[in-house]
Amino acid sequence: YGVRFTPNGAHPFLSFPLSEIYNQVVPLDAVWRRWASEIREQLHAVPSIEAGLILFERWLRTRLRETPKTTDDQNVVEYAIAAMRQKHGTLSIQKLSNQIGISQNHLGTLFKRLVGTSAKELARLYRFEHVLRSVSHTHPVDWTQIAQRCGYFDLSHLNKDFVAFTGDNPTDYLSLHRRVSTGDTLLDPLSLCTLPTD
């Protein structure tokens, strides 16, 4: 079983800053200490994967009800994430901080604690996600035009992100994507790269 949280979705279930486990694989016992064996035992007893997913969702909802109410810090981060996502990661962190009415440093501290990474890095991920969703997977691609449209300074800036997130340059990535796509059924372009969870 696995859980994919939104960028600010995991914090209510943890008692420590997300920066301590960001982009890492950690044992369930290290994350949920006292609950780990309880949930593990319950999941082993279910008859099917579907039943396990239902059980796990119920378990998460119960834990969520036990957590304190949403804080001002969580509201700030939620607002910032929504603004970044709406602008596909192109909104400057300084402008965002000014909109919210807090310093960039304070916003950075909140993001490290509640999201696990910096606001700048999350914006970078949203911008790259926008690139992947903007690319035609069946027609020729003008990478320079894509870079400009998605808020990159130039093509080398886009290439740097491609290599960082996928291990390939844009052309090789698209070639691989087209090879593994079959007929009219195209794979989700995000499935071919390892973006830190959103």
Go through each PLM region and give its residues:
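Intrinsically disordered, low-complexity sequence elements enriched in Ser/Thr/Gly/Pro
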Residues: G2, L122-L125
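Alpha-helical bundle regulatory/interaction domains
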Residues: Y1-Q94, N98-Q104, T117-S118, R133-H137, ...
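DNA major-groove recognition helix of helix-turn-helix
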Residues: F111, A123, D161-F162, L174
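Major-groove DNA-recognition helix of helix-turn-helix-type DNA-binding domains
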Residues: L114
